[in-house]
């Protein structure tokens, strides 16, 4: 079985795949100071609850946008699963797609993994929107090449910034407002963030499609994707497992024939 690890800025997701079937998925706050032993004990306990054991894992793959986490994640794979991990972004890992950028080394591993999964699943041309710590828009052409995109502040990051930088604005949770015109502070904040991001999504999708010069299918992933997809026709598909499935695809592509 394959242990796939997606280490993001906010959370790190661990998933076990048996072929195409996902046998378990667990999430922890990303912390570069968390040791391999701490992660190993935690993960093995959760695997046991799903009927999985340490010996079931025979391969591992890591994608991380936080370089400081990679060492301990490597140690986790070596020490607890006796598996040298495949690490997305390293020269010996073939993604199977072109990266049409001036500085390919600057692209986050998660964005490339999403591009791989999106092209394999839906073909192109595509826009992939990932609602994470940042909200990213990534363009994949019909041949599967990663063409770049746009990066905006994440929804929760924007809400937190409003609270931290403004003396009278409270910390609020994102939600769909009942009205555009808020009659109190919290409804006004929810309207501004939620509907503002709907406008951001629609505006960027329109501009990207116009610049690309062809109709594009829009795939959304990340925890907030359903909340925003219900408010706009700009998003055609929600794919919760896009990043993890991308890791599965990349691992298979790098196996000996």
Swiss-Prot record:
ATP binds at residues 6-13, 133. InterPro entries: ATPase_NBD, Type_III_PanK. The active site is at residue 110. Pfam families: Pan_kinase. GO terms for cellular component: cytoplasm. Substrate binds at residues 108-111, 185. K(+) binds at residue 130. A monovalent cation. Ammonium or potassium. One of its GO terms (molecular function) is ATP binding. Pathway: Cofactor biosynthesis; coenzyme A biosynthesis; CoA from (R)-pantothenate: step 1/5. Its EC number is 2.7.1.33. Its cofactor is NH4(+); K(+). It catalyses: (R)-pantothenate + ATP = (R)-4'-phosphopantothenate + ADP + H(+). It is an enzyme of class 2 (transferase). Keywords: ATP-binding, Coenzyme A biosynthesis, Cytoplasm, Kinase, Metal-binding, Nucleotide-binding, Potassium, Transferase. It is found in: Cytoplasm. PANTHER family: TYPE III PANTOTHENATE KINASE. Homodimer. This is Type III pantothenate kinase. It comes from Rhodospirillum rubrum (strain ATCC 11170 / ATH 1.1.1 / DSM 467 / LMG 4362 / NCIMB 8255 / S1). The lineage of its organism: Bacteria, Pseudomonadati, Pseudomonadota, Alphaproteobacteria, Rhodospirillales.
């Amino acid at each position: 079985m394959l242990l796939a690890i997606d280490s993001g800025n906010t959370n790190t997701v661990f998933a076990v795949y048996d072929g195409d079937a996902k046998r378990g998925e667990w999430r922890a706050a990303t912390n570069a100071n968390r040791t391999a032993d701490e992660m190993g004990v935690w993960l093995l306990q959760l695997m046991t609850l799903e009927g999985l054991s340490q010996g079931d894992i025979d391969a591992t793959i890591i994608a991380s946008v936080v370089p400081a986490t990679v060492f301990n994640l490597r140690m986790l794979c070596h020490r607890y699963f006796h598996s040298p991990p495949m690490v997305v972004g390293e020269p010996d890992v073939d993604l199977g797609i072109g990266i049409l950028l001036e500085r390919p080394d600057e692209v986050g591993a998660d964005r490339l993994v999403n591009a791989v999964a999106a092209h394999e699943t839906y073909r192109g041309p595509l826009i992939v929107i990932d609602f994470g710590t940042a909200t990213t828009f990534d363009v994949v052409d019909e041949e599967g090449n990663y063409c770049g995109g746009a990066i905006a502040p994440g929804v929760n990051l924007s809400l937190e910034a409003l609270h931290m930088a403004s003396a009278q604005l409270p910390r609020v949770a994102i939600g769909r407002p009942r009205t555009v015109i808020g009659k109190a502070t919290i409804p006004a904040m929810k309207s501004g963030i939620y509907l503002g991001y709907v406008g951001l999504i629609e505006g960027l999708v329109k501009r990207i499609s116009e610049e690309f010069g062809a109709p594009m299918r829009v795939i959304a992933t990340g925890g907030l994707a359903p909340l925003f997809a219900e408010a706009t026709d700009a998003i055609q598909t929600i794919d919760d497992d896009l990043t993890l499935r991308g890791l599965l695809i990349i691992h298979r592509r790098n196996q000996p024939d």
